[in-house]
Amino acid sequence: MDAQAAARLGDEIAHGFGVAAMVAGAVAGALIGAAVVAATAATGGLAAVILAGSIAAGGLSMFQIVKGLTTIFELPEPTTGVLIRGSFNVYVNSRNAMRAGDDVSATCSGLPLNHPLWPFPVLIAEGSATVYINGKPAARLQSKMVCGAHIKTGSQNTFIGGPTERVAFVLDLEEWLHTGLEALGLAALAGGLLLAAMAGVAALVGVVAIGGLMMGGMALLGDLGDRLGPGYRDLFQGVAGMALLGFGPKLAGRRPAAVTSETAQRRAYLNNKFGRSGNLDHDINYRGNRETAAKFFKSKDIDPADAESYMNGLDFNHPVRVETLAPGKNLWQYQSPGAPQGNWYTLSPRVQPTELGINPMGTNRAANTIEPKVLNSYRTTQKVEVLRSTAAPTDDFWSVKGQSYPAKGGAQQLFSNEKGSFGLLPREGS
């Protein structure tokens, strides 16, 4: 550490504006983040990433702005206390020299926004690790007090060098808050990259490219600030950070360019085909559910054409998962009269056919008549792997030839092509 002015009896302590700046910036960031979430209709993980990133960016940017302005214009920090006592035999400028771990400030007001009035003596917690006075580290300008304040005035002609030694616990709210905001920002960055990766390679590349440009721009502003003098790096980077944050709601609420009817229809078709809704969190879940179903059908050697037909009967807006049923599990299945056992089962006999995406009527092929479907009961005879899903609203055109029935879907269903794992139970009274 560069040599700093020696602290003396009567020198002042201060907290500065760091905590107040970070709190104000974090509040502003939270409001801006909420506006972005509202403009994009983001939910879940995406909303959390936006809010966390906005809070961190707002707090850290405002801290840099205030720090830069204070340095450039030498803005006075409000005095919160005065050093008392001091060495009994070492003097600086005819005033008692101050020692860490021994000497104190009479009180500390905690202004602005650091802590309530500290009505009892406040110990000096830091000093030089190489210069000692009466066996104690010599206190100097910027040495911390146990309340988190620092010594703000010192000798004009006596300086003390060496690294800093801390001899007491410091209630450093400013440092803790700054570290917390940095951690929050890194967590938001990691979450954003994870969501982008789940959305696809193109999204991940775009996020990385934009992030790289922003970091490069901040580095250039910092270099420019260093050339102009102390404080300008913080000021330039802080202003840029708040400006980028302020543009967020405008960019999020920007209306897309007008498209032709043909383009709109093509876009709607692709969005429906690939489960794109504009809600990233929803889209990630949708694609994950679809991938789970596709992998299951492939693992069971289902013909690709049949698998695609089965996929059309699943509502990927709801969870899709693979489960293993134990022996003795009761299930039910609707079948046309005289038809063989199928692959789809329901968990409750109270579920209606239309809720399973099928017509309640079926064709009795032996009599060539249209009759209500029969509900048969089954019980698992061994462990069996099934696909649990929710039936999608669909038009059943296969139950009755020449008819299309609009089934509403919405019920839970299980799929398995291992028919030998399900034993048909006798009907009651038979």
Swiss-Prot record:
Membrane topology per record: Multi-pass membrane protein
Record has Transmembrane as a keyword: yes
Single GO BP term: protein secretion by the type VI secretion system
Main location: membrane
Enzyme Commission number: 3.2.2.5
GO cellular component: membrane
The entry's keywords: Hydrolase, Membrane, Transmembrane, Transmembrane helix, Virulence
Name of the top EC class for this enzyme: hydrolase
Transmembrane segments: 17-37, 46-66, 193-213
Superkingdom: Bacteria
Reactions catalysed: NAD(+) + H2O = ADP-D-ribose + nicotinamide + H(+)
Presence of keyword Transmembrane: yes
Subcellular location: Membrane
Phenotype when changing residue 396 to A: Approximately 225-fold loss of NAD(P)+ glycohydrolase activity
Gene Ontology molecular function terms on file: NAD+ nucleosidase activity; NADP+ nucleosidase activity; toxin sequestering activity
Role according to the record: Type VI secretion exported toxin that acts as a glycohydrolase on bacterial target cells and degrades the essential dinucleotides NAD(+) and NADP(+), thereby inducing bacteriostasis. The activity resides in the C-terminal region that is initially neutralized by the cognate immunity protein Tsi6.
Oligomeric form and interacting partners: Interacts with Tsi6, VgrG1a, EagT6 and EF-Tu.
Protein name as catalogued: NAD(P)(+) glycohydrolase toxin Tse6
Taxon lineage: Bacteria, Pseudomonadati, Pseudomonadota, Gammaproteobacteria, Pseudomonadales
